[in-house]
């Protein structure tokens, strides 16, 4: 039986400024990677609230990403899903930094890099026993897949390609080392060029 996954990039409509302007929005690469890692028996839909507001639909699973700026809206969407009996999973920077907070709103939290843990979560979900918390680890660069861009149906002005992860600097104001570690990891240049084409 086919299953349906809805991936949502929430936008906090109460905030003003560039973060809510479609002309400055960018593709959420993390959700594109999740789409790449999701097996073919799942139908995938994607909503970016910079362009289109979330509305409840018949899906098996809703996946949310989160920066701190949009976490309140992500929690709002999760609450709507819960009211309608839809299972929610949340990842991204905010959920990774504050997993206990996120757990108060969603069914499952995935913290850290998701490449190695998303397939495990999906297997558990399909078996009917998903965990409440999964901790991802630093993904070897050769296992970082290309972003599945066909799900991005909106007229993004900006496009991104992730060429590396991690940073050795550990600046106080930055979350990169907490999320991706202090080891700087570069993707293979041929793989990056292939993705750009």
Regions found by a protein language model. Give the residues of each.
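Short glycine-rich His-centered loop
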Residues: 2-25, 79
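Nucleotide donor/acceptor-binding cores
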Residues: 3-4, 60, 159, 196
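Short beta-strand segments
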Residues: 6-9, 63-65, 162, 175
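N-terminal [4Fe-4S]-dependent radical SAM core
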Residues: 14, 124-163
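Glycine/Thr-rich phosphate-binding loops of Rossmann-like dinucleotide-binding domains
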Residues: 15-16, 72, 119, 171, ...
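Alpha-helix N-cap and loop-to-helix initiation/capping positions
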Residues: 22-26, 69, 109, 113, ...
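Glycine-rich beta-alpha loop elements in corrinoid/cobalamin-binding modules
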Residues: 30, 34-143
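Radical SAM [4Fe-4S] cluster-binding motif and immediate context
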Residues: 145-197
